[in-house]
Amino acid sequence: MLQANGNELYVERRGSGEPLLLIQGMTGHSLHWGEPLLAALERDFELVLYDHRGVGRSAASDQPFTIADLAADALAVLDGLGIDGAHVLGISMGGMVAQELALAAPERVRTLTLGATYCGGDGARFTDETVVNALAAAILSGDPERKIRTGWEFNVSPRFATAEGNLERFSQVADQYPITLGMVIAQVQAIMGHDTSERLAQISMPTLVVHGSADQILVASNGELVAGLIPGARLELLDGVGHLFFWEQPERVAQLVAEHAVAARA
């Protein structure tokens, strides 16, 4: 555990190589990366995993926060571990946190990989209302199985959602350390206040933007917008893949992140 801005955060390190800070999305904790992705990434990096305040194995928290506050937590993780600079991979809400981290402390971010994320502002598209309503109804139903199943169906492609064993493997992760309704609301409020659209031009480190073309949570035009606003950013669209693209194509994602780091050193 590590103290970060008055919050006690769960932190884990695994693998060897240059450090890669992984920043999870809304409701996600460090197990939500999935073992296939982590095993692939640790062939090239020392992975720095942590759980957001009030989530997973981190201590409970009842204070409101912004995405910038979560970025300050991420920076505190690097400080607490004595890491001067790291490659950064942020997914969904974690991609928003990574944007703020790159803007606040660019000297600490060697490369930036933003996955399935959103910058706010003109042109950005938040989650469709019908999807939000379906997810909210599942969360409020009090039925854990319905909540996991509904979230799964909206977060991955239909083909992957129905393939044998995939939901069961995800459920084994999602059943652990369930998030409170209060923290879900706090994260939604933080996301709704997120807007880096007019500041992304300040990002100067090598940036890769990855998005699934079949993302139902944050449609792919969001990735196109983010990549277009960051000077020199490269966009990688994964065809037919949903929001949790790193569950659907873990080896490909690990390859993209590793190649991005190698290219930055060239």
Language-model region placement:
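Conserved HGGG/HGGXW glycine-rich cap/lid loop of the alpha/beta-hydrolase fold
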Residues: 4-59
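Acidic catalytic loop of the alpha/beta-hydrolase fold
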Residues: 214-218
